[in-house]
Amino acid sequence: MVALDNLTFIAVNFKALYKFLQGMEWNPNCLQRSVQGVLSVLLSLKKNPIIRYQNFSSLARRLAENIRDTILKESSLFHFHRGESIPLLLILDRRCDPITPLLNQWTYQAMVHELLSIKNNRVSLVGVPGAPKDMSEVLLSAEQDEFYANNMYLNFGDIGQTIKSLMDEFQMKAKSHQKVESIADMKAFVENYPQFKKMSGAVTKHVTLVGELSRLVTQHNLLEVSEAEQELACQEEHTQSLTKIRRLLVTDQIRDLDAARLVFLYAIRYHKHQSKDIVGLVDLLRRRGTPVRLIDCVEGILRYASSGETAGSSILTTNDVTKITEKIFKVRATQLMI
């Protein structure tokens, strides 16, 4: 594992993660590497945590037991003072909720990852309409960008309002810098110029990023796609959902990835429904030219979700969250104006 920032760690070898199961049991080598990865994070953070895991999952239990045994065996390495707040290592089995990873994300950081992609804390703006010519790539790091650190978890609507406030503040400071009439004014300008220039760059960067996110949301019809996803995850309207998915799959506006995700969600949600039409939806994916690698995932995702169905069934009958979705998008019109 490597650290992206002080809150985020990722596995280096992603392909290995897909091979850790042998008939829904741990591959011994992958179990060992997973234990080593978690332990390396604990050591880097200087934490000796209490370990909790989901009771239904034998996979989570084995991982927890191996981590505990190693910590006890190497107790001298984990002799850290716990303090008043005891750290907790919580091990969850993704099978209890196969829905959430398939949903489109609507927070600032997640949308940049999903729609623009971040590599080594850098976002490429090559080909982005309206992007400044000298801004082909921007740095997006919580450690070096105060605005990003404070707003990375805001939803799409709120981030638009926040950037508008940043712009208003910048415009006020820009006006004050226009009045350089005395030696004192010149001195103040020189002293504040680095901060002013930094703020100018931050405004330009984030306005450009959010503007591009807004364009992509419209281009790929992500609002309607996300609404269909929420209905699949949280409502009991099979006919309504099936009709909406069929309509979306025959449009060219949505991405192949979003089309496939809708079918994945439908398959997980309604694979036991007497009127299910998974085969028909898969056929629509083929007709629209969806890559075979995505189509082939339908069966695998169903098998994966079914293996944890007993624990995860309650996830699929959550109360309606349409109001939450509406809240996320409520200020989109304002955001598009910045």
What does each of the following model-derived ranges do?
Residues M1-I338:
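Extended, well-folded catalytic/binding cores that form a central cleft or groove in large enzyme
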